[in-house]
Amino acid sequence: MSMPSLKKYAAALFAVFLMGQSVAAHAQLPDFTPLVEAASPAVVNISTRQKVPNAVASNGGLSVPDLEGLPPMFREFFERSIPQQPRAPGGGGRQREAQSLGSGFIISKDGYILTNNHVVADADEIIVRLSDRSELEAKLIGTDPRSDVALLKVEANDLPTVKLGNSDNLKVGEWVLAIGSPFGFDHSVTAGIVSAKGRSLPNESYVPFIQTDVAINPGNSGGPLFNLDGEVVGINSQIFTRSGGFMGLSFAIPMSVAMDVADQLKASGKVSRGWLGVVIQEVNKDLAESFGLEKPAGALVAQVLEDGPAAKGGLQVGDVILSLDGKPIIMSADLPHLVGALKPGTKANLEIVREGSRKTLKVAVGTMPADDGDEATNDAAPSAERSSNRLGVSVAELTDEQKKALDLRGGVVIREVQDGPAALIGLRPGDVITHLNNQAITSAKNFTEVAQSLPKNRSVSMRVLRQGRASFITFKLAE
């Protein structure tokens, strides 16, 4: 056989090999057909109506509606097509109906349905459309804004239901599938994989989200996320996007969280969560060095609320929480949802680092208050006594009134910031310094003494109160 013939023969064999690989790879892809056929009947479309003031502005004789209440796909269309004008004053006397669209799924034959809180929030009427196109009015049993879970009930019997799975067993890289009503297109199916678990999102402290690359769009909210066994492992809730559409970052509420919330809503119409009564922050590399940790990990306690569970259990400012009941705290965001999942009254074991030493505290978890916002502010005028130091700040003693308002025994208030380390780390007049280099500050004189003894070329921590919120910051003093 000639050389050209050998080359052609080898090329043909290689092509056959590639085709075989492609066929084998295709054969390994999951077939979602049985799953979709079995699960779809239990997935529902949810539409809501809400009466809102009708604000209408004039646009050259053309009546331009207020677009805020329209479903997202219609609102985006009109925003592109009709320029919005300022609302006409006094136009709120009349009312109109605002509508929204979402998804949900049936969890019991007698009509209990799970969806997102943001799908049904403030609705005057909730309509559930089943897979056979029949519609039922739903009653809102309860909502939980902190987890974005809502429980509905329709009056019906022998409804199709989903199979509930254990989201704790979900693995990163596992195939998952969503069924919902994106932009109102009922029972649309999309698939992808689990990208990560235990994700924390801004202002969503109590849910360890499942991150996927499943295509999720407006209208998918509240719909189920299935594993390959046809079990619901999450409720599709949010996407991260810069364009308003899907960008490969979707987030679902784990069913372990959703069902705990649903059970409480069904039993009492409200949700109780565990609460420590602390303000925490992330431990970065510099803070880890400052507090003598081997690596950045845990939740740094920046503030302990007076008479709260943590205070009663002996937790102190500057403690670093490493684990709760044996579960490691890798990032500070891990702590809130672990504590929140505990029943109030539970005695939890907290492993902490305090002044370089490890110890375990037993803390009785309290009940999260309805409003866990900031408790103290600092707006009183500082006293006239001053003390300057090598950090580039002038400080003053706190008055007794300030200490009482801020629940402090010591500390100093910044009067002036000059050029130097303080300016570089963003300190401002009015900030209150309570700790420096892991030492509590008792007076302006004490602050100056501690500042003068600070080490050079090593991370140093400082605890600062600004408008009632405490945090640790770090800096280094050069030679």
Swiss-Prot record:
It is found in: Periplasm. It comes from the Bacteria. Residues 368-390 are annotated as: Disordered. InterPro entries: PDZ (IPR001478), PDZ_sf (IPR036034), Pept_S1C_Do (IPR011782), Peptidase_S1_PA (IPR009003), Peptidase_S1C (IPR001940). PROSITE patterns: PDZ. Belongs to the peptidase S1C family. This is Probable periplasmic serine endoprotease DegP-like. It comes from Pseudomonas fulva (strain 12-X).
